[in-house]
Curated annotation (Swiss-Prot):
Protein name: Inositol-3-phosphate synthase
GO molecular function terms attached to this record: inositol-3-phosphate synthase activity
Localization: Cytoplasm, Cytosol; Nucleus
EC main group: isomerase
Catalytic reaction annotation: D-glucose 6-phosphate = 1D-myo-inositol 3-phosphate
Family: Belongs to the myo-inositol 1-phosphate synthase family.
Claim: Iron-sulfur is one of the keywords in the record: no
Pfam families in alphabetical order: Inos-1-P_synth (PF01658), NAD_binding_5 (PF07994)
Gene that this polypeptide is encoded by: INPS1
UniProt source species: Nicotiana paniculata
Amino acid sequence: MFIENFKVESPNVKYTESEIHSVYDYQTTELVHDEKNGTYQWTVKPKTVKYEFKTDVHVPKLGVMLVGWGGNNGSTLTGGVIANREGISWATKDKVQQANYFGSLTQASTIRVGSFNGEEIYAPFKSLLPMVNPDDVVFGGWDISDMNLADAMARAKVFDIDLQKQLRPYMESMVPLPGIYDPDFIAANQGSRANNVIKGTKKEQIDQIIKDIREFKEKNKVDKVVVLWTANTERYSNVVVGLNDTMENLFASVDRNEAEISPSTLYAIACILENVPFINGSPQNTFVPGLIDLAIKKNTLIGGDDFKSGQTKMKSVLVDFLVGAGIKPTSIVSYNHLGNNDGMNLSAPQTFRSKEISKSNVVDDMVSSNAILYEPGEHPDHVVVIKYVPYVGDSKRAMDEYTSEIFMGGKNTIVLHNTCEDSLLAAPIILDLVLLAELSTRIQLKAEGEGKFHSFHPVATILSYLTKAPLVPPGTPVVNALSKQRAMLENILRACVGLAPENNMILEYK
């Protein structure tokens, strides 16, 4: 059974006009390695920590500024939100299609809230806490190309022509602000697009981005802004002591106009200084140590890296299943080809290397979780290939071969073929990232013994379900298994309304 909304009635939760206040018993374990009777042994001690959560229920008017607004992802997301807001339908060769938010965790998935008369009851994910309605989001952003969003949508060739015709009047007046362009960080083949760039030193470029954010906020009368990088994948930045390893050194490097400070890092610096959440949707190492240091000191949300949309999402499910079933993946070979501008930019070796790293690390935590299957230091052979094939456009092909060892020396091979519209998978993920980032800024918590409420850690692990290479605070374990990531996100939001985590025990029927 499906219900549209619900309210929790419990002594552990209180609703007021301004906030939801909940008390939550967090049950976890503590491990002790000590000597008993002359030998060392592990002891696991269950423990309960009481937390309190406060969620501001005022839903702000949200502005979203995209770096790379005129790219396939930016034009697809903007057009998709307009189509939903205006209730647009269009003819395809199969049927009349209605606008929807399929592919969005927040808008098109559900959570289990209990059972009634022997039937499971589900509610929309977005009903857990007050969230921004995507139809109300105001879009803007930057691009190194001055092409308006209607022409960018036509160039992308993602939407059906009938839909493009209906969207054009809404989008042809949308023109990106000039963006930061540094040809050293992206493929040379992107130079022909770069007719809309911010001149000056790196310090002057940061100042211009700050000015753009302030003017966008004022012009559109939005309460909050979230900035997200959906521009070209950059090459990795060199992390060097004295250059970008601390906040102070990073600022000094900007003042010296050091060449190794990337455009994406400059955008992030501007956002952090303005206390505006910044999310990196590409695989490069935007968040150099000095930038993370700055975000922590300014307590500004940062999240990333790289949208987890197709092949990698499947991988984080399948490898988790295999290792969890006691099957040993020994070889993972992933091949991709695509023909959009992302594929064109990734045809350069230095930018491909960034993508290869983010795609390759996705199985690490699952492998390290099972020392029965893997010896220390042992890891599956893992190869990732991406090729640019212009003809296929945004219709990305992904082929994977998983070879595993099974019972008594046997071998098992699984082969997958996945064809998808790259931007139609990425756009709802971008939407989820900005909506959840905004929601995160309205949640405060404190553990038993802490004197006052505080926000989540600025490095937003809560967004990890949506990213290939989750950014985590120093010393925090990285979790890539998709089911664990979703459970973490859902259960934190459940805690904010005083609900227990979904453990699937269903003891009442046992």
